[in-house]
């Protein structure tokens, strides 16, 4: 089975790289197509995958096609519906649910195009990702099972109802940027008090990774973990109170709301 990436920006490349490095796909099975052919060829060469000169070439070579273009470009790249007949389309575009594709394909209901909408995040590149999969889709049962099995090699896959697809996508897909901001802020504080920049980034990143792992593996509630770290009249509780005074919780909720309003 060959897999194509129609669009090869940050998210498409992260997912392709993760799947190849995890061994879920062989490089020889993977193709990509993008407008900037020079950049595409360089990226494909580094991964050992095939670069396609046109959408038509990619479609001809692929059974599964990841749509990794902007939502505004979807109708354009799918203009030639006939060439996608019998293919499995896997959307990575924010705001493009199953219903959106059904509306797009409504004029040609018999072309046999099956589709599923996903919202992955960049950590898929290192097999530590999260992928939100919309529960509603038009894939055959065996196709759906096979696809989820492949995706689980690089991510925690969460299947959610359409009503929660957007909010789950924001938490999984946008929040890595929020987490990176938090890491950067911690590192800035470390540098302010004498740490070397690279060491400060290492400490902050590993702290966040370890804290997340502890919550996942032990099942401890985040509030309980916070309480475990805070000793009476200690330095940690002083820091926690400072975060509350500065509105950390409110800022995070506002950030999610802002991201959700544009999805």
Swiss-Prot record:
Q: Does the keyword Cytoplasm apply?
A: yes
Which pathway does the database say it acts in? Amino-acid biosynthesis; L-proline biosynthesis; L-proline from L-glutamate 5-semialdehyde: step 1/1
Q: What is its main location?
A: cytoplasm
What Gene Ontology terms for biological process does this UniProt record contain?
L-proline biosynthetic process
**Listed EC numbers:** 1.5.1.2
Q: Which GO terms describe its cellular component?
A: cytoplasm
Q: Which Pfam families match?
A: F420_oxidored, P5CR_dimer
Which terms in the Gene Ontology molecular function aspect does this entry carry?
A: pyrroline-5-carboxylate reductase activity
Q: What is this protein called?
A: Pyrroline-5-carboxylate reductase
């Amino acid at each position: 089975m060959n897999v194509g990436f129609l669009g090869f920006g940050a998210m498409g490349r992260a997912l392709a790289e993760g799947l190849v490095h995890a061994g879920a796909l062989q490089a020889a099975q993977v193709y990509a197509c993008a407008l900037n052919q020079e950049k595409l060829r360089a990226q494909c060469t580094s991964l050992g995958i095939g670069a396609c000169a046109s959408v038509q070439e990619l479609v001809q070579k692929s059974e599964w096609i990841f749509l990794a273009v902007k939502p505004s470009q979807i109708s354009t790249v799918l203009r030639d519906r006939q060439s996608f007949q019998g293919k499995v389309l896997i959307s990575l575009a924010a705001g493009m649910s199953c219903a959106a594709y059904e509306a797009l394909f409504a004029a040609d209901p018999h072309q046999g195009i099956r589709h599923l909408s996903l919202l992955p995040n960049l950590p898929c590149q290192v097999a530590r990702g999260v992928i939100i999969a919309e529960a509603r889709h038009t894939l055959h049962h065996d196709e759906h099972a096979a696809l989820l099995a492949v995706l689980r090699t690089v991510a925690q896959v969460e299947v959610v109802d359409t009503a929660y697809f957007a909010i789950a996508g924001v938490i999984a897909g946008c929040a890595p940027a929020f987490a990176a901001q938090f890491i950067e802020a911690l590192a800035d504080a470390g540098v302010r008090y004498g740490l070397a920049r690279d060491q400060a980034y290492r400490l902050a990143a590993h702290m966040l990774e370890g804290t997340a792992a502890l919550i996942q593996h032990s099942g401890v509630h985040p509030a309980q973990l916070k309480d475990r770290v805070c000793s009476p009249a200690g330095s940690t509780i002083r820091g926690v109170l400072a975060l509350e005074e500065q509105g950390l919780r409110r800022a995070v909720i506002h950030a999610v709301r802002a991201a959700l309003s544009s999805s």
